[in-house]
A protein has these predicted regions:
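Residues that define the transmembrane beta-barrel architecture of outer-membrane proteins
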Residues: 23-27, 68-72, 117-121
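C-terminal beta-signal and adjacent terminal beta-strands/loops
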Residues: 49-57, 78-129
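Residue-level recognition of alpha-helix initiation/capping sites
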Residues: 67-68, 78
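Generic structural signal for short, solvent-exposed loop/turn connectors between secondary structure elements
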Residues: 38-42, 61-62, 79-85
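Gram-negative outer-membrane beta-barrel transporters
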Residues: 1-58, 124-128
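Outer-membrane beta-barrel domain signature
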Residues: 16-20, 60-65, 110-114
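Short, charged/polar low-complexity linear motifs in solvent-exposed/disordered segments
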Residues: 8-11, 61-62, 102-105
Length: 129
C-alpha cells in the first residue's frame, strides 16, 4: 500500500511491511474446576495464552519485535451471593514482550514500546449489583 508514513508529503510504497500485532498463530487454553463450599461456590482457574511472533510498531522496527510467548495465569476464587473473592497470579512465567510499539515521527526521532507487565499477583473482591 502507498502512504505518507514519514511526513514528507509524498506517499511511498510500504507493501513490504507486515501488519502490526498480527501473529500467524494465537491460542488460548483454559481450565476451570468448581465445587460447592459451604454457602458459596469455590473454583480454581488456569489459562495459557500463546501469541506468535509479531511486530508491534507500524514500521516493523526490530527493537519492538515480539518473539513468540505463552502467558500463564492462575486464580483461586470463592463466590458468595454476588461477591467474588479471588487470589490471582498473572504472567507467572514472566514473559517480557511488548504490548504496543510506536514510531515517533515515523521512526526518524525514535521508536519505543510499552512493556508487558511482569509477574503480578494479588487479591481482589468483586461485587455485582
Amino acid at each position: 500500500f502507498f502512504a505518507d508514513f514519514t511526513g514528507s508529503g509524498t506517499p511511498a510504497d510500504f507493501t513490504y511491511l507486515e501488519p502490526l500485532r498480527a501473529p500467524d498463530l494465537t491460542w488460548t487454553l483454559g481450565l476451570t474446576y468448581e465445587w460447592e463450599a459451604g454457602p458459596g461456590l469455590a473454583y480454581v482457574r488456569a489459562s495459557a495464552h500463546h501469541i506468535g511472533e509479531h511486530h508491534t510498531s507500524q514500521l516493523n522496527s526490530p527493537t519492538t519485535f515480539n518473539k513468540e510467548q505463552t502467558l500463564v495465569d492462575l486464580s483461586m476464587n470463592y463466590e458468595l451471593n454476588n461477591t467474588v473473592f479471588a487470589f490471582f497470579a498473572k504472567n507467572i512465567t514472566e514473559e517480557d514482550g511488548f504490548t504496543v510499539g510506536y514510531d515517533v515521527f515515523a521512526g526518524a526521532a525514535w521508536t519505543y514500546a510499552m512493556a508487558r507487565k511482569p509477574r503480578t499477583w494479588g487479591i481482589s473482591i468483586t461485587q455485582t449489583f
